[in-house]
């Protein structure tokens, strides 16, 4: 596992993304940036309900009035049509097609976005009298610092909710998830610790599986802390959001290495038709090399996807090349491991061991295929629901997969009966020192 630790350190050093973009935005309105891009992009938000609110505070009113500073709000679909239109709209024509406009001539401005039949994404742009001019020198004027708060109506209809339509419900979900982890820890932590402490054939597998579970629990806790703060100020704790993503990726790497080492080790030993040695986890250089190579490949794709996606989620709808390659990799892994286990199952005569391999195959396939399947299913949902469906669905499916694997590895009766049949072919035997008797 030393290589895995080095990989985790490398991920920490190479990638520490920004947290989720807050809905309390701070920055500066820049005439230069607005002129270069024909409108400075400030942010986007998924408004819903009848009393959504955009609040902007500025200090330098004189500069704003002198520059004729304005904010332009475009619905996402309308803005996309403008960008893809073949009419070749000029800068001023594009800005004139904004659904909502706000002139900034006061310290604080409130704009109500109402009568929204369904949640919609709105893009906010800044522009002034210099934006559509060709003269660059006139735009070299003082920037305007601002604070912008984007709010949706809460359950009572008051604009106090910092969560966009695509984020609503995630705070409550992570609270329930942390609560479930806490209850499970209170019930099973002691017995699990005793099982790990005793050692035995499943010692290393249980350690790696428990480490992956702890990383997932840490990710859920970090997300809950971030969203709890986010619900109050619209910013949250970006460090905790980044920490949650890192924990999740580390957990994915742990589980991938575990499952690959087990499956590849069994397959290679079966191909050699060696009956004089037990099926060992990570027993051959070939299985180790294959596992490390695939883990490195997934890690590179995860890093690539995170750098390309500015929103930074642990799970994505896969609209870029890196995300598509991740889906292809996971499908290929599920198919290859499924085929390898199927070959083992078909030639296995022992009913108990065949049952073991079938259950393990279910856990593997569920772990690898849940993300691609949910990414495909999410297409039928609205844009604002897709990331939420994938995030919640993947976490629940992978949790079920870990429960299946835990029950399998901790099944005393199954391993006792299998070991009594033949300790030489006992699945998951770590070393020859454990051949003499089963350990639980």
From Swiss-Prot:
Gene symbol here is GPR180
What is the protein's name according to its record?
Integral membrane protein GPR180
Q: Could you list the residue ranges that cross the membrane?
A: 173-193, 202-222, 249-269, 284-304, 321-341, 360-380, 389-409
UniProt entry tagged with the keyword Transmembrane helix: yes
> Which region is the signal sequence?
1-22
Key words, A-Z: Glycoprotein, Membrane, Signal, Transmembrane, Transmembrane helix
Q: Which organism is it from?
A: Homo sapiens (Human)
Q: Which residues are glycosylated?
A: 105, 110
Is the keyword rRNA-binding assigned to this protein? Answer: no
Membrane topology field? Multi-pass membrane protein
Which top-level group of life is the source organism from?
Eukaryota
Q: What is its main location?
A: membrane
According to its UniProt record, where is this protein located?
Membrane
Its GO CC terms? Answer: membrane
One Gene Ontology term from the biological process aspect of the record: lipid metabolic process
């Amino acid at each position: 596992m030393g290589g895995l630790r080095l990989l985790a350190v490398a991920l920490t050093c190479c990638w520490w993304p920004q947290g989720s973009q807050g809905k309390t935005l701070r920055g500066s309105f820049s005439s230069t940036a607005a002129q270069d891009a024909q409108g400075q992009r400030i942010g986007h938000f998924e408004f819903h309900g009848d009393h959504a609110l955009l609040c902007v505070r500025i200090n330098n009113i004189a500069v704003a009035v002198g520059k004729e500073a304005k904010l332009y709000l475009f619905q996402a679909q309308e803005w996309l049509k403008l960008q893809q239109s073949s009419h070749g709209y000029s800068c001023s024509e594009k800005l004139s097609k904004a659904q909502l406009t706000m002139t900034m001539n006061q310290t604080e401005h409130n704009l109500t976005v109402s009568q929204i039949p369904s949640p919609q994404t709105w893009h906010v742009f800044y522009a002034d009298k210099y934006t559509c001019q060709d003269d660059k020198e006139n735009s070299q004027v003082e920037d305007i610092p601002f604070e912008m708060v984007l709010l949706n109506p809460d359950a009572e209809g008051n604009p106090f909710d910092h969560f966009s339509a695509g984020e609503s419900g995630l705070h409550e979900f992570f609270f329930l998830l942390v609560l479930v982890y806490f209850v499970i820890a209170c019930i099973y932590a002691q017995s699990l610790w005793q099982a790990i402490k005793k050692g035995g054939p499943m010692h290393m597998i249980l350690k790696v599986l428990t480490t992956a579970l702890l990383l997932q629990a840490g990710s859920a806790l970090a997300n809950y802390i971030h969203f709890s703060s986010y619900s109050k100020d619209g910013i949250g704790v970006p460090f905790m959001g980044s920490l949650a993503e890192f924990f999740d990726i580390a957990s994915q790497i742990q589980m991938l290495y575990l499952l690959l080492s087990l499956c590849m080790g069994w397959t290679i030993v079966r191909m050699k038709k060696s009956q004089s040695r037990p099926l060992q986890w990570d027993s051959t250089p070939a299985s180790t090399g294959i596992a490390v190579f695939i883990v490195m490949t997934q890690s590179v794709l995860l890093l690539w996807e995170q750098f390309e996606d500015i929103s930074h989620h642990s799970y994505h709808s896969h609209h870029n090349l890196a995300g598509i390659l991740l889906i292809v990799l996971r499908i290929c892994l599920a198919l290859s491991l499924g085929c390898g286990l199927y070959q083992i199952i078909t030639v296995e005569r022992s009913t108990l061991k065949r049952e073991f391999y079938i259950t393990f195959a279910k856990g593997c396939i569920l772990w690898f295929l849940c993300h691609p399947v949910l990414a495909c299913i999410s297409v039928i949902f609205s844009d604002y629901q897709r990331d939420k469906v994938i995030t919640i669905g993947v976490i629940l499916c992978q949790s079920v997969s870990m429960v299946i694997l835990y029950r399998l590895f901790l099944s005393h009766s199954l391993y006792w009966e299998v070991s009594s049949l033949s300790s030489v072919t006992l699945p998951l035997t770590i070393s020859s020192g454990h051949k003499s008797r089963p350990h639980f």
